[in-house]
Design a protein with these regions (language model features):
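Amphipathic alpha-helical segments of the small helical/lid subdomains adjacent to P-loop NTPase cores
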Residues: 9-12, 26-136
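Terminal-proximal interaction/regulatory segments of ATP-powered molecular machines
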Residues: 182-270
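P-loop NTPase catalytic cores that bind/hydrolyze ATP
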Residues: 1, 87-171, 191-205, 241-244
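Flexible loop/turn segments at secondary-structure boundaries
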Residues: 9, 23-28, 56-60, 136, ...
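Structural recognition of the conserved hydrophobic beta-strand(s) that form the central parallel beta-sheet
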Residues: 11-26, 241
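An acidic- and aromatic-residue-enriched active-site/binding cleft used to recognize and process polar
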Residues: 19-24, 54, 106, 131, ...
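Extended hydrophobic secondary-structure segments that form protein cores and membrane-embedded regions
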Residues: 1, 15-22, 48-52, 257
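Conserved catalytic/switch belt of AAA+ P-loop NTPases
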Residues: 2-9
């Protein structure tokens, strides 16, 4: 405001440039109407130049980063890539999954969406791929935590949970993350396999609104196949978790959900 009202503005031109993680109006999206109007006045002093990476661009950046890291490809890479092609997942990133190893195809689809919705876009993306923070790609490799050489979806859950303090998500999106986080935090007496199921479903739920992936039994069976204990198959685990209230199945959408609530947005209506 001081810059705008300066008497010598014409003689001393000055441009203020800011880089935002969200659209300008999104920072006040969940505020009261009065604050939104005041925020709109501030927005009126700026000119927006929106920029959003395409899935192809993001996939290319991920592939180049992984190429520089020279990470060894999993032994069953060809088999997993063929399965991804059979499930018609290739178009999600407009890129061959071969270039994204050791990210499991579903992990490669989820990662950009999580970074844009719940992180800080490319900053979060490159931090996961290139840093040595706990739960990052390098940390998983150094601690021999990969699953048959793959970074799995539940690895992403653990990493983003640890770095949740740096999220720039909209309050409405952040609330959904908190709901899932609270649900899993309060889950006691579950096996490691059951926790992996819930973490995977939780991430699918967070990204399903963008059409990326949905937590149906076909995708869950594929991504959890290598982890399924012989004495406790996935179908039995899903039935047990549903009966104990940890998740629910929505038949009309063919999707498992961590939260029980409906799609009705009470906050928006109020």
């Amino acid at each position: 405001q001081l810059i705008e009202q300066s008497e010598n503005r014409k003689q001393k031109p000055l441009a203020l440039i800011t880089l935002q993680h969200l659209a300008f109006e999104d920072y006040a999206a969940d505020s009261a109407a009065l604050r939104q109007r005041e925020w709109a006045k501030i927005q009126g002093r700026f000119r927006d130049f929106p920029f959003s990476d395409s899935s192809r661009t993001t996939g290319f950046l991920m592939a180049r980063c992984l190429q520089k890291l020279a990470v060894e490809q999993p032994a069953n890479a060809s088999e997993v890539w063929a399965q991804a092609n059979g499930l018609e997942l290739v178009d999600q990133l407009s890129l061959r999954f071969e270039a994204l190893a050791p990210l499991h195809p579903l992990t490669a689809i989820l990662l950009p969406d999580l970074c844009s919705k719940y992180g800080q876009h490319e900053r979060s993306l490159f931090k996961f791929l290139g840093s040595s923070d706990e739960g990052s790609l390098q940390w998983l490799i150094n601690n021999d935590a990969l699953v048959d050489g793959w970074v799995m979806p539940w690895h992403l859950y653990d990493y983003f949970l640890a770095s949740a303090g740096s999220t720039s998500a909209l309050p409405s999106l952040a609330q959904r993350w908190i709901e899932i986080q609270t649900r899993l935090r309060d889950a006691v007496g579950l096996t490691g396999f059951e926790l992996e199921i819930l973490k995977t479903i939780g991430l699918f739920n967070l990204c399903s609104s963008s059409g990326a992936v949905r937590a149906n039994q076909q995708l869950l069976a594929w991504v959890l196949d290598a982890r399924e204990p012989e004495a406790y198959p996935l179908a039995s685990a899903l039935e047990q978790l549903s009966s104990t209230g940890f998740m629910t199945y929505r038949g009309q959408a063919d999707e498992y959900r961590i939260w029980r609530g409906s799609d009705f947005d009470l906050g928006e209506q109020v």
